[in-house]
UniProtKB/Swiss-Prot annotation:
Subunit structure: Interacts with NACA (alpha chain of nascent polypeptide-associated complex).
Similarity comment: family membership: Belongs to the asfivirus H339R family.
Subcellular location: Host cytoplasm; Host nucleus; Virion
Induction conditions: Expressed in the late phase of the viral replicative cycle.
Main location class: host cell
Protein name: Protein H339R
Keywords attached to this entry: Host cytoplasm, Host nucleus, Host-virus interaction, Late protein, Virion
Amino acid sequence: MAGRVKIKQKELIDSTVKNKNVMNLFHEIIGSKGNINFSVVWPKFKKIKQSVYDYISTLSVLEKASVMQNFEDDKKLLELFVQKLWAAYEGYFKYPEIEKYEVEGQVNFNLVPQYVLEKFSQLYRIRINSELVTLILNSCAFMSKYNDYILKKDPYILTITPGLCFSPIPNFEDLNFKHLYNSDKNSQHDKDFIMFILYKLYMAALGVYNAISIPDIDVEDLENIILSSVSQIKKQIPRCKDAFNKIESSVHLLRKNFNTYYSDYVGSGYNPTIIMEQYIKDISQDSKNISPRISYQFRTIIKYYRDMIATKHQTMDPQVLNLVKHVEKKLDMLDREKN
């Protein structure tokens, strides 16, 4: 059954490629024009939301714990900080628009009203790039330096780290685990509890990081778009078989290197062209023995796109233009290496 679904999905993409501009399709898959793949993004968002909730809840448990009765000033400051985090959570994540359409954890997005989907799309990037999520990611980055100690709940971490303060939360040194742990007021049970809180805080922060790192894209859909578009275009450009074969045979590089491509995509401020740029770069680097004939065929394909755009009196997207220039530059470099 799963195989049939994938075949039908590819047939749908093949049909769609015939009727849409390939770059527009790419933008839709990548989500750069406000379109997002809900079947991929919604589960990702739920994981982020749950992990953010767990992070704040862990701090809330610490704030209410009996051990904090020994640190009255710290408790008050932590209470105020947790209140601010909950307020931010309510503002960014307490939206049940799609959740109420879930049945046993699954959503048929065809049954969700369009205005609900549009609202989620508009807020999605704002939510995952919010100050709250950024704070937790920075917290994760700090704690990850002491990964082995925290996972083992080893208090030695509070000895080897420099200074008098060990605060896993950026700009909130009032939560000083060294101060809490080393107090003479604590029993061994209290000390174990403090290390457990640090562990849970790290697990929640890791949960946010791991969820954020999940691509918003179905890589298989992206592969199918590339293959289907090549299949359509090569019928219109004769005597470029070798170049098209090279593109088709190199699609495996997309899946192999996709995590790196996606990291570059996020780091570029969600510029979708960066994925294609890096992909083409890898094709050229993987093709050091490319012949002048294949190089000429690549140039013919590029010229076809230029002529097609000019014929339709369309303005070339600056990102697409940069992509074309990147390919041409790479071909020039390969040509020079041959001479």
